[in-house]
Amino acid sequence: MMKRLMAILTAIMPAIAMAAEGEASVAKGLLYLGAGLAIGLAGLGAGVGMGHAVRGTQEGVARNPNAGGRLQTLMFIGLAFIETIALYGLLIAFILLFVV
């Protein structure tokens, strides 16, 4: 019960604060929501992708320890590409917050 109350209060309090300022608009609130979703989902996707990449590399090293160096190099290259997804999400969030 307490968790639900906290979730409801967390969702309502920013709207109350924005209404008190007098500048509140639905469009601005949706921009903030979109920016939060952009970075949140991009981070989630990147985290899941990195987890799968590291797991695959560890399984490969466990099967063939001699290929560890090559697999580690390929994993780091793959992690760099996966991390760009999170950076694109951050870029979209900044565009939504400061340009639109």
Swiss-Prot record:
InterPro entries associated with the record: ATP_synth_csu_bac/chlpt (IPR005953), ATP_synth_F0_csu (IPR000454), ATP_synth_F0_csu_DDCD_BS (IPR020537), ATP_synth_F0_csu_sf (IPR038662), ATPase_proteolipid_c-like_dom (IPR002379), F/V-ATP_Csub_sf (IPR035921)
SUPFAM superfamilies per UniProt: F1F0 ATP synthase subunit C
GO BP terms: proton motive force-driven ATP synthesis
User: Could you tell me the membrane topology recorded for this protein?
Assistant: Multi-pass membrane protein
Look up the record and report any one GO term of the cellular component aspect. proton-transporting two-sector ATPase complex, proton-transporting domain
* Main location, first listed in the record: membrane
Q: Which residues cross the membrane?
A: 30-50, 80-100
Q: This protein's superkingdom?
A: Bacteria
Q: Where in the cell is it found?
A: Cell inner membrane
Q: Which Pfam families match?
A: ATP-synt_C (PF00137)
What keywords tag this UniProt record? ATP synthesis, Cell inner membrane, Cell membrane, CF(0), Hydrogen ion transport, Ion transport, Lipid-binding, Membrane, Transmembrane, Transmembrane helix, Transport
According to the UniProt record, which cysteines are disulfide-bonded?
A: none
Marked site, Reversibly protonated during proton transport, at E83
Q: Which GO terms describe its molecular function?
A: lipid binding; proton-transporting ATP synthase activity, rotational mechanism
Query: Where does the UniProt annotation place the signal sequence?
Result: none
Instruction: Tell me the function of this protein.
Output: F(1)F(0) ATP synthase produces ATP from ADP in the presence of a proton or sodium gradient. F-type ATPases consist of two structural domains, F(1) containing the extramembraneous catalytic core and F(0) containing the membrane proton channel, linked together by a central stalk and a peripheral stalk. During catalysis, ATP synthesis in the catalytic domain of F(1) is coupled via a rotary mechanism of the central stalk subunits to proton translocation. Key component of the F(0) channel; it plays a direct role in translocation across the membrane. A homomeric c-ring of between 10-14 subunits forms the central stalk rotor element with the F(1) delta and epsilon subunits.
* HAMAP family membership: ATP_synth_c_bact
Self-association state and partner proteins as the record states: F-type ATPases have 2 components, F(1) - the catalytic core - and F(0) - the membrane proton channel. F(1) has five subunits: alpha(3), beta(3), gamma(1), delta(1), epsilon(1). F(0) has three main subunits: a(1), b(2) and c(10-14). The alpha and beta chains form an alternating ring which encloses part of the gamma chain. F(1) is attached to F(0) by a central stalk formed by the gamma and epsilon chains, while a peripheral stalk is formed by the delta and b chains.
Q: Which PANTHER family match?
A: ATP SYNTHASE LIPID-BINDING PROTEIN, MITOCHONDRIAL, ATPASE PROTEIN 9
Which family is this protein grouped under?
Belongs to the ATPase C chain family.
User: This protein is called what?
Assistant: ATP synthase subunit c
